[in-house]
Structures are given as structure tokens and as C-alpha cells.
UniProtKB/Swiss-Prot annotation:
Gene Ontology biological-process entries: translational termination
Family per similarity comment: Belongs to the RRF family.
Role of this protein: Responsible for the release of ribosomes from messenger RNA at the termination of protein biosynthesis. May increase the efficiency of translation by recycling ribosomes from one round of translation to another.
The keyword Protein biosynthesis belongs to this UniProt entry's keyword annotation: yes
Gene3D superfamilies to which the protein is assigned, alphabetical: 3.30.1360.40, Ribosome-recycling factor
InterPro entries referenced in this protein's UniProt entry, alphabetically: Ribosome_recyc_fac, Ribosome_recyc_fac_dom, RRF_sf
GO molecular function: ribosomal large subunit binding
GO CC annotations on file: cytoplasm
Name of protein: Ribosome-recycling factor
One Pfam family, short name: RRF
């Protein structure tokens, strides 16, 4: 019973770390990746569809992306969705592909993105700590109900604390890498 609580807590902590990875991938750095387009949704024949399902992405230069739609009729809707997104870019359409040149990040914009990354990391840490608190309450309840001994409860809390520190450390490492990536010119 205690082992189930610990396993459940570890799964939820792992999920918090993976959400943090996704959030960090969506924060733009000097190099563009297709992940910056992951939140863009296109109105495709009346259905909201992620742009990554409608086109392929080619990155010939660090700040340029070429989007090639699988269906040429979706070209205008993809262009509109990218233009209306919060990326702050103006795509150009030549009839078969969409070419996007991202502007160079200013020092102020880089610092703003570092703040965004730090807030995403803090959200992940809070989520991990909430999972820990919930699991600790579950362990305490199991011990109080007499389904496990106090020694086993203390051992489980120690394991839970170690897992919490491990996952918070992973988030801190992801943040450190993202900050280094953002601040490198």
C-alpha cells in the first residue's frame, strides 16, 4: 500500500518534469526548433488541427524556418495561424512553401525569456512539492489506520523526500541549461 503511494508519487513527479521540458522547449532561443510551433493550431476544414500535423519543417539557417504543407490548400490557413500566433513573426508565402525569418533576440528579450523559464521551473517545483505533500498525507493515513508500521512509514517518507529532491534537481538542471542557452549569443 505504501509502495503504491510512492510509485504513484514518482509517476506524478516524472510527469511534472516532462511538462517542464515541454514548457522549456516552447521558449524560443537563438536557434529555432519546430517545438516553437507546437502550440499553434490551424483551422483546417473547420477542425482545429496542430500545425505540426499539416506540414513539415525545414531549418536551413539558425533563424529561418521553411514550412512545407502536405496539402497545398492549407497554405493560407497555416500562414494566418503563424501570423496570428504570439511568435511575433511575419511569414512570407511563395505559393508552395512558407518562409519565416525570426528576428535576432535582443538582450532585453533574452532576459525576459529567462524570467519566463524561471517561472515555469518554479511551477514545476511547486507541482512536485504538492505531489510530495499529497503522498505524505497518504502515507500518514496508512500508518494511522494501522495498515503499516511507523518504521515503514518513516522509511517511505525518507524515500519520498529523496525522490522529491531528485526531481527538483532535474528541474533545476533543465533550467540551468535553458538559461545558458538563452543567454549565449
Amino acid at each position: 500500500m505504501i509502495d503504491d503511494t510512492l510509485l504513484d508519487a514518482e509517476e506524478k513527479m516524472e510527469k511534472a518534469v516532462s511538462v517542464a521540458k515541454e514548457d522549456f522547449a516552447n521558449i524560443r532561443t537563438g536557434r529555432i526548433t519546430p517545438a516553437v510551433f507546437s502550440k499553434i493550431v490551424v483551422d483546417y476544414y473547420g477542425a482545429p488541427t496542430p500545425v505540426q500535423q499539416l506540414a513539415s519543417f525545414h531549418i536551413p539557417e539558425p533563424r529561418m524556418v521553411i514550412i512545407t504543407p502536405y496539402d497545398k490548400s492549407s497554405l493560407a490557413s497555416i500562414e494566418k495561424a503563424v501570423r496570428d500566433s504570439d511568435l511575433g513573426v511575419n511569414p512570407s508565402n511563395d505559393g508552395t512553401i512558407i518562409r519565416i525569418v525570426f528576428p535576432e533576440l535582443s538582450e532585453q528579450r533574452r532576459r525576459d525569456l529567462v524570467k519566463v523559464a524561471r517561472s515555469k521551473a518554479e511551477e514545476a517545483r511547486v507541482s512536485i512539492r504538492n505531489v510530495r505533500r499529497h503522498a505524505k498525507d497518504g502515507i500518514d493515513r496508512i500508518v494511522r489506520d494501522g495498515d503499516a508500521g511507523e518504521d515503514e512509514g518513516r522509511r517511505a517518507e525518507k524515500d519520498l523526500d529523496e525522490a522529491t529532491h531528485r526531481y527538483v534537481g532535474q528541474v533545476d538542471e533543465l533550467l540551468r541549461l535553458k538559461e545558458a542557452d538563452l543567454l549565449s549569443v
